[in-house]
From Swiss-Prot:
Acetyl-CoA carboxylase is a heterohexamer composed of biotin carboxyl carrier protein (AccB), biotin carboxylase (AccC) and two subunits each of ACCase subunit alpha (AccA) and ACCase subunit beta (AccD). Residues 48-308 form the CoA carboxyltransferase C-terminal domain. This is Acetyl-coenzyme A carboxylase carboxyl transferase subunit alpha. Signal peptide: none annotated. It is an enzyme of class 2 (transferase). Its EC number is 2.1.3.15. One of its GO terms (molecular function) is acetyl-CoA carboxylase activity. It is found in: Cytoplasm. One of its GO terms (cellular component) is acetyl-CoA carboxylase complex. The gene is accA. One of its GO terms (biological process) is fatty acid biosynthetic process. It catalyses: N(6)-carboxybiotinyl-L-lysyl-[protein] + acetyl-CoA = N(6)-biotinyl-L-lysyl-[protein] + malonyl-CoA. SUPFAM superfamilies: ClpP/crotonase.
Length: 334
């Protein structure tokens, strides 16, 4: 069994939880000849420590810095695209290949059914997302979630297929960036991403994009042009990672916390700036602490958005999408 991953700011909480676990084990192993008073005293200590743990947990996770949210977005136990697909949909059929070069395992996609009997909703959708690995072997297989040009071309092929059959598209974004290797550049990485932006803007079906973890630069925006942009509470979305920004501005990664503050990459920041439309709330401590609850929350929000988008005419969807992205950013005319 792999060891629990504890982030640096979580260590005080982890230490208290470990102490609480020890006390519970001590109570469980209490022998019959111990006095009731001793057991009552231990019960009282446990209850007091439980309250302290809960207060500390809320204090930590309700006051996260931007850099701490970046760390949570990268948590190795966090749900990935395939996890969400299997939690939210049924009948997922993965489709492979870009029909030009190869099948990029860093991007997955295929048709699935999104349904909620209580809401009276059932809809076939195209699910597309970045996919990371859980260990060294699967991370190498998935290229750490960094897509090659063929990955973006595969995604576009699936989007055009969904458009042909009039199915809405849902993209799940979670990448440290597009793969920066020489071979990716030789095969047209920039062109592949740019073409996705152009083509996604003109799709005549509803497109919903969800940042579920990391949303780094062109690697993220290559799947990020939609009618609705949703963002998980503890995810980040920016033109550059805090570490890379730090290395460029200060010639060192030691200023990543300051870079994160300057970049303002969190869901709250981007909602205020009008970049994203809704924040997907996470369980206290992050999506990985209760993946099922996180999946249910996201599923409900996706159904809400689709119920609003599906009745719209194709040309209205295109016009609203283009207007949405045209309004982003700040510039001066001279």
């Amino acid at each position: 069994m792999s060891a629990k991953v504890v982030l640096d700011f979580e260590k005080p909480l982890f230490e208290l939880e470990a102490k609480l676990h020890e006390m519970r084990e001590c109570l469980r192993n209490t022998t019959r000849d111990q006095s009731p008073a001793d057991a009552d005293l231990l019960y009282g200590d446990i209850e007091a420590l439980e309250r302290k743990v809960e207060l500390l947990r809320r204090s930590i996770y309700k006051n996260l810095t931007r850099w701490q949210k970046v760390q949570l977005a990268r948590h190795p136990e966090r749900p990935y695209s395939l996890d969400y697909i299997y939690m939210m949909t049924t009948g997922f059929v993965e489709l492979a290949g870009d029909r030009h070069f190869s099948d990029d395992k860093a991007i997955i996609g295929g048709f699935a059914r999104l349904e909620d009997e209580a809401a009276g909703f059932s809809q076939s959708v195209m699910m597309i997302g970045h996919q990371k690995g859980r260990d060294t072997k699967t991370n190498l297989y998935r290229n750490f979630g960094m897509a090659q040009p063929e990955g973006y071309r595969k995604a576009l092929r699936l989007m055009k297929l969904a458009e042909k059959f009039r199915k809405p598209i849902i993209t799940l974004i979670d990448t440290p960036g597009a793969f920066p290797g020489i071979e990716a550049e030789e095969r047209g990485q920039a062109e592949a991403i740019a073409r996705n932006l152009m083509e996604m803007a003109q799709l005549t079906v509803p497109v919903i994009c969800v940042i579920i973890g990391e949303g780094a630069s062109g690697g993220a925006i290559g799947l990020g042009v939609g009618n609705r942009i949703l963002m998980a509470e503890n995810s980040w979305y920016s033109v550059i990672s805090p570490e890379s920004c730090s290395s460029i501005l200060w010639r060192s990664w030691n200023f990543k916390e300051q870079a994160a503050e300057a970049l303002q990459p969190t869901a709250e920041d981007l909602l205020a700036q009008g970049i994203v439309d809704r924040i997907v709330p996470e369980p206290l401590g992050g999506a990985h602490t209760d993946p099922d609850a996180m999946g249910a929350t996201l599923k409900a929000m996706l159904i809400e958005e689709l119920q609003q988008l599906l009745p719209k005419e194709p040309q209205l969807l295109v016009r609203e999408r283009i207007e949405k992205f045209s309004a982003m950013g700040v510039w001066n005319e001279v």
